[in-house]
Each structure stands twice: as C-alpha cells, then as structure tokens.
Amino acid sequence: MADPDRYNKMFPVSWEQLHRDTRALSWRLMERGPFKGIVAITRGGLVPAAILARELEVRLVDTICIASYDWKSQGGISVLKGVEGDGEGWLIVDDLVDTGTTARAVREMLPKAHFATVYAKPSGRPVVDTYITEVSQDTWILFPWDSEIQYVQPLVNRRQEG
C-alpha cells in the first residue's frame, strides 16, 4: 500500500466494478462525442480506454505514457511518450485523478481534449471534465490489476490485534 500517513482508507475495486463504472462513464460521454479517438494515460487508463473504445465505437486509440506513481507514493512527472496536436476532438482517459498532477501535465499537452476518469478525488476533480465516482482524498484505490485474491481476517479480529 501507499504512504500510511496519506491514506487512511482503502477502496478495493473488482474487475466487475471497474467494468460497470466505466460503462457508466460511457453513458455520460455519449452526449459529448463523437470523438476522433481516445488517448489513454498509461498504465491506469489502458483498461478503461479499451472499455470506452468498445462502448463508444471508437477505433483510434493512442497513449500518453507518463510515470508519476509507484506502489508506495506519488512522485514527479516523467513523460515517456507524448501525443501530437492540441487534443481537439479527442477523449483523454485515465482510471483516476488524485492530486491532479498528472492530469494537469496532460491538460497542458492537449488543452482542447475532453478529459474523463472513472474515479476522482477532491484535489484533482476540477482538472477533469467527466468522472463517475468520487472518493475521499485519504483513500487508496486498489485496482484489480494491482491485487490478487487472498484471505483477510474478519474486521473484529483485526481490531483486537491492533
């Protein structure tokens, strides 16, 4: 998990929940389109972008490759691959907007694109145009590609241990 001083809660997202939430996002985006294409922010935006591409019948999908997180913390922005143009007619997709650092960097590169995320936290929410679910700033979202199924102690047992 990430920095324990920054994240007090955990929000596990299953593959099924992510799919439902991304389909809900597609309903909101239908009235904004059609889009020329989708730009997925790697790596978190890849799965939502694939679902949105299917639901919105978008065949052109590109990526912006940015590194800002590791499994422990959020760091500085490193653009590994950009995209040409100003983003007009394009849909930018990411799984989450947290502090807004990554989103602001992408906004600077593609100022005319429509920016959508599945999940949004209060600090980053103003940077995106469309999102589905808001979670508190102190919540770590555990995405299905970052986890595996394992046994977890019942809450009452964990409380007694701690």
Swiss-Prot record:
Main location: membrane
Ligand binding (guanine): D98, I141
Pathway the protein acts in: Purine metabolism; GMP biosynthesis via salvage pathway; GMP from guanine: step 1/1; Purine metabolism; XMP biosynthesis via salvage pathway; XMP from xanthine: step 1/1
Keywords tagged on the record: Cell inner membrane, Cell membrane, Glycosyltransferase, Magnesium, Membrane, Metal-binding, Purine salvage, Transferase
Residues that coordinate or bind GMP: D98, T99, G100, T101, T102, W140, I141
Binding positions (xanthine): D98, I141
Keyword Cell inner membrane listed: yes
Compartments in which it is found: Cell inner membrane
Membrane topology per record: Peripheral membrane protein
PANTHER family: XANTHINE PHOSPHORIBOSYLTRANSFERASE (PTHR39563), XANTHINE-GUANINE PHOSPHORIBOSYLTRANSFERASE (PTHR39563:SF1)
Protein name: Xanthine-guanine phosphoribosyltransferase
Gene behind the chain: gpt
